Amino acid sequence: MDFARSKRNSSHTMIFKNGRLIFPNGVRDGLDLLVEEGLITAIRSQAPAMGEQIVDLQGNYLAPGFIDLHVHGAMGCDTMDANVDAFRAICDYHATGGTTSLLLTTATAPIKAIIDAVKAVRDASKSIKQLAGVHVEGPFVSKAKAGAQRASLMRKPTPKAYGLLLEHCDVIRRMTLAPELPGATELIDRLRENGVSISGGHSDAWEDDARTAFEHGMRNVTHTFNCMSSTRRRGIDRVAGLLEFAMSEPEIICELIADGHHVSPTLMKMLYRAKGVRGICLVTDATAGAGLPDGSKFSLYGTKCVTEAGVCLLGDRSALAGSASRMIDLVRTMVAKVGVPLHEAIVMATDTPAFGIGLNNKGQLKIGGHADLVVISPEIEVLSTYVGGEQVFRS
């Protein structure tokens, strides 16, 4: 489907017309959106174009581009490959699902390998606009909640272990850690000093561990319901784990892999009713198997995995190994299976993650914001994706 008909003029101004614009508080018709030099410069009542490049939306939705804070890979490529070609392939695939900004996410690995990936992202971000930084997931996590990550490489956070990582906080935007580990509180303090978002995950924490981490600045949890402690008995008392603490604390934002496999619709409904639209951040947690045909084999930093029936599995098929989803797939699931209004599902994929890592000019259709945009059909399929006003995908 070809939306852009007229030639770009010398002022590089585009006008998106005849669409349904999605804002945090609902959907509005009868508005034009103007883009100039990669920024949204006006949102106004429909008016005749004055020489701008017209993008006729033909009654489809126009939403902010999606922001994925947890993506390991796609198309056989992984963040730990640490090269620009892999990163470009990952971004190109996720653009088909409406993603315009993402945090490439590392695996539990030796510190040197993680730093190599971080350095590669820093270099690649000069040419790949979608790269917003790195999410370091491990190695400071719990072996008891390893999931698909390699427990043998998990370690306690010591200044010697994390000191080199702290030299790269210009690129590291988020770190997942287990709050119960000795030294975790000190690491949280150092991360906060350096402007890094802290997320509790792959954790066997008791509720007092979670509360201490919260008091020191943890404001997120990683892939809620997956690889985290839940309610259990301590002596004769039943107490909360990281899951229940996160659900009960209004300031904590919960990542959610809404692919219908990691978390059932009933659990997603429970989370939505507990946290609301501003307390849920949709993430794909996509691994290298995303976009590959069934039967494809891939690796999650040394762990053998396979794609089957549209999901990513460990090689022995015993558990999930990340997801094969794109952000649009998660939005569709939230609408179709959880009953979330479309504009709220969009917020979970845009404004909430933008807030989570301080992307102040992304995540909403607003004057002065980046022209990162996605055109969506009534069937909730991506028709076109724009980054900084430049079309990077068209169906």
Predicted segments, located by residue:
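Active-site gating loops and adjacent loop-to-helix segments of metal-dependent hydrolytic enzymes
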Residues: D92-L102, S142-C169, T212-I253, P293-L320
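Active-site core of metal-dependent hydrolases
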Residues: E167-D294
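C-terminal cap of metal-dependent C-N hydrolases
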Residues: G19, F355, Q364-S395
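Alpha-helical scaffold segments that flank or form the walls of functional sites
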Residues: N60-Y61, L69, T79-Q130, L153-H168, ...
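Divalent metal-dependent hydrolysis catalytic cores, especially in the metallo-beta-lactamase
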Residues: H72, R88-A117, Q130-S142, C169-E180, ...
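His/Asp/Glu-enriched, well-ordered alpha-helical/loop segment
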Residues: R238-L256, Y272-T284, A290-G369, L373-V375
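N-terminal metal-binding scaffold of metallo-dependent hydrolase/deaminase domains
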Residues: M1-A49, Y386
